[in-house]
Curated annotation (Swiss-Prot):
Role, per record: Catalyzes the reversible cleavage of pseudouridine 5'-phosphate (PsiMP) to ribose 5-phosphate and uracil. Functions biologically in the cleavage direction, as part of a pseudouridine degradation pathway.
Species this protein is from: Caldanaerobacter subterraneus subsp. tengcongensis (strain DSM 15242 / JCM 11007 / NBRC 100824 / MB4)
Biological-process GO terms, alphabetical: nucleobase catabolic process
Annotated residues for binding of Mn(2+): D138
Positions bound to substrate: K86, V106, S140, A141, D142
Gene it is expressed from: psuG
Source lineage: Bacteria, Bacillati, Bacillota, Clostridia, Thermoanaerobacterales
Protein name: Pseudouridine-5'-phosphate glycosidase
Amino acid sequence: MNRFIDLSEEVKSALEERRPVVALESTIISHGMPYPQNIETARALEEIVRENGAVPATIAIIGGKIKIGLNEEELEFMGTSKEILKASKRDLPVVLAKGLNAATTVSATMICANLAGIKVFVTGGIGGVHRGAEETFDISADLQELANTNVAVVCAGAKAILDLPRTLEYLETFGVPVIGFRTEEFPAFYTRESGLKVDYRVEDEVEAAKVIKTKWDLGLKGGILIANPIPEEYALDRAYIEKAIEEAIFEADRRGIRGKALTPFLLEKIKDLTEGKSLKANIELVKNNARVGAKIAVQLNKLYKEA
């Protein structure tokens, strides 16, 4: 195994025994949610993955080591320490070389999962093309990782703070299939609809797993995006959340907040503007993704064992 990687016993034995494993990111713990909801959600996600037949592997960097599968103490540390950096692809070599602590974004988690041989990764929403990117060029590294790294990503679409039409155009340019899980519409994180279409729809986990395996069997590199809408009962009203997003973006512009600080700032501001409703929605959508992601991992694992 790669010298930078430290597998938990649970994950190590699952990989050795060819059991299904699901990667989970840590940015949601350190930068995406406040304490204690962050730790509670992280534990709940792991439990949901187990209940649905797979082994959870929460990924983070602690002391310059890529930890794949965190224990209680490490989860607590990621959720409470103020010393946690946010590591994307470009940050990985520096964080590892300097022995630092960092939460992994979607792009970094995909890289780490791929190094460990984990094929399915569950997150809330991916990063993408930011609003105003035609001037700022602010485009998340998540999109390039989806173009290049063989990991299937289950999400509730892209984060609603982004420019969703341009995000989908970017994914199309780089040949990333955007598959709707029981939906024809690309979900917009807090809402089930965006007015934008996905490329294809699948009806169940078996179909999703077949598409994923077929892509890689063809030798086509890169990921697949499985867009799984937030459950109806937790979805927010589109006009209501859009108003909060626009206010938050205006405030970020006014304060000159850019780069990797932008997304955490916007999520926090939207939480305040919606009196916590956006946080509740965020927690529920990622739990739903964990359910679907674990089931897809189980089916994909079956297909690989049969091959």
